[in-house]
């Protein structure tokens, strides 16, 4: 048995779970918010007890010390020696990393080199790595990349129709994201179906405030909806998804906005927020959809884009064995799943409205005779991080 810390470090936040492996049992979990502020928030949950404090947390190193001290002071562990390894989420692995990797000084340097591909996320992820290495220098640490799962995509899926030197000199290509989630649910789907992953054609729909659809054939990602950045693909909470690129200079010309300002609109002021006119939260939009035409339109656009990707990816794989719904909306929105699945019967997808009336629970929602299965699988990226950390740290799980 091993105790693995799964870490997700943001620019001013630090999420953590202490997981007992191989049982995947969460012993403790918590969140540090507003790092660098005088009123930072530290919350931890262990043994059913929740503790929350507001205090000054100067930087990530202080946050890590608080995190570790809370684990010992609450008796979750007796000493830091009981932490066998630490797994870090890293958003972008570029073309360097097609798998998770044991962290060394050389690996840290490579992550730094590709940080320009994810300037908001990779530096924050690295800050978390440095903070833990400072306090737990002898403990093995593993980097788990959001992009790694998609490195199996063939060139025909990831290349853009742009001058070749843009790819060769600047790394411009499709990378895809949410890979850790797509990998986890695909492995879980194989278990539930009782079929080896190497014999399955799956479409994984990770639908939260950010959303992506991935075609998984024989256990490998062969295409995914997000692109060079997480802005591409389907309509999302505040992100536009795919648009005509000529709109960017057109909007600049009409509004006087800079390219960065237009990009900010596409990332933070578009998507469901723009379509509905009042919220990026699907729950709010669903609530008003019966009486608000724009809310109903937002739901139709959101579901319709995902619906199209399912048809496209089924064609790309020459068939389909199962559709997976995961993440906050995918797991909990009966309405969105219904809108996405309606009209796919011609593909052999027969879903049961009664079974679909479920939230946050692992469940098949197809009729027994349906050739294509439809499964809700709650994602667990932390468990996937822990599994990869155990595998690469050489721990006996």
Swiss-Prot record:
Pfam families on file:
Acetate_kinase
Q: What is its main location?
A: cytoplasm
Is Cell membrane included in the keywords of this UniProt record? no
The annotated pathway is: Metabolic intermediate biosynthesis; acetyl-CoA biosynthesis; acetyl-CoA from acetate: step 1/2
- Superkingdom as given in the UniProt entry: Bacteria
Keywords from UniProt, A to Z, are: ATP-binding, Cytoplasm, Kinase, Magnesium, Metal-binding, Nucleotide-binding, Transferase
Where is it located? Cytoplasm
Q: How is the cofactor bound?
A: Mg(2+). Can also accept Mn(2+).
Record protein name field: Acetate kinase
Source organism: Oceanobacillus iheyensis (strain DSM 14371 / CIP 107618 / JCM 11309 / KCTC 3954 / HTE831)
